[in-house]
Regions:
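Short coil/turn linkers that connect adjacent helices within long alpha-helical scaffolds
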Residues: 41-43, 78, 119-125, 158-166, ...
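Residue register of alpha-helical TPR repeats
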Residues: 16, 44, 48-51, 86, ...
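Structural register within alpha-helical repeat arrays
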Residues: 21, 49-56, 91, 98, ...
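Short coil/turn connectors between adjacent alpha-helices in alpha-solenoid helical repeat scaffolds
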Residues: 22-27, 53-69, 95-111, 139-149, ...
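Tetratricopeptide repeat
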Residues: 34, 67-70, 74, 110-117, ...
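C-terminal non-catalytic interaction modules
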Residues: 1-22, 26, 202-257
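Residue signature of alpha-solenoid helical repeat architecture, marking inter-repeat boundaries
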Residues: 12, 47, 82-89, 126-128, ...
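TPR/Sel1-like alpha-solenoid repeat signature
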Residues: 88, 128-139, 152, 169-180, ...
Length: 257
């Protein structure tokens, strides 16, 4: 089984015991423990370590200073265009997370960093699909442009399919389904959310399973919607309330008069 790193850099972990341990910790919301297993002495290790700590920020709304320090180390060690592009992609994601979660408005920094990454990572390169996905996030959630977001997500989906990046596919399926749901395309939304959930369960990506369950619940009717939401809430509690932004979506719907 390949355990793709969120940075898109060195995506196949193979049978390396350290990478297997990193994946298991990451999938259980133990990003700091996973990062501690990586010595940032090479560009690849530094990038992977930074990506873990950036992901922790997005899921927990904590650890911003540690992520910034790890990112600076990765930027200093990056030599090739792909490495510099991957570091810029992580910087864009950190700025996006800070903006989305209301920590600080860094939208301009996010756009500039992902623009730099696009100039450095060639189409078809391993990190390009992840970059396209993150540009879609900016388009959807910061620029509020669903058409641009859909185009970016589709490019990311095609790239993830070509590179057999199952984890990234779980994200592209979910976000394309979210756009379909907003447009009232229930069958398309259910299909995408179901695929995302299936992949995450197969990979053992526990921290991403509760959001996938909650998303599918939004596209289902009762009693299935409540069953899915209850299972998402169980996993959410199991992981100590992570991701933090999921809590409002797990509250039972208000009773109607």
């Amino acid at each position: 089984v390949a355990y793709p790193a969120m940075s898109g850099y060195g995506t196949a972990a193979g049978d390396d015991p350290v990478q297997t341990a990193v994946w298991r910790l990451r999938s259980r919301a133990c990003w700091a423990d996973a990062a501690a297993l990586l010595e940032p002495v090479t560009a690849g290790a530094a990038l992977q370590r930074a990506s873990l700590l950036v992901e922790r920020c997005l899921y927990t709304e904590q650890g911003w200073a540690e992520a910034e320090d790890a990112l600076r180390t990765a930027e200093a060690l990056a030599r090739s265009d792909d490495e510099r592009g991957a570091a810029a992609c992580e910087r864009g994601q950190l700025a996006y997370a800070a903006t989305l979660l209301g920590v600080r408005d860094r939208a301009d920094e996010a756009r500039a960093a992902l623009g730099r990454a696009a100039a450095l990572i060639a189409p078809g390169a391993p990190g390009r699909a992840l970059l396209d996905f993150r540009r879609g996030l900016l388009a959807e959630n910061l620029a509020h442009s669903p058409q641009a977001a859909r185009a970016a997500y589709r490019r990311a989906h095609a790239g993830a399919t070509a590179q057999d990046d199952a984890l990234l596919l779980s994200f592209t399926w979910r976000h394309l389904a979210g756009l379909a749901l907003r447009e009232g395309e229930l069958a398309e939304a259910r299909h995408g959310f179901t695929e995302s959930l299936r992949i995450r369960e197969e990979l053992g990506y526990l921290v991403g399973t509760a959001p996938a369950l909650a998303s599918l619940a939004d596209a289902e009717i009762e009693p299935e919607a409540s069953r899915l939401r209850a299972e998402a809430a169980r996993l959410f509690r199991l992981l100590g309330g992570v991701p933090t932004w999921l809590a409002p979506r797990l509250a039972p719907p208000a009773a109607t008069a």
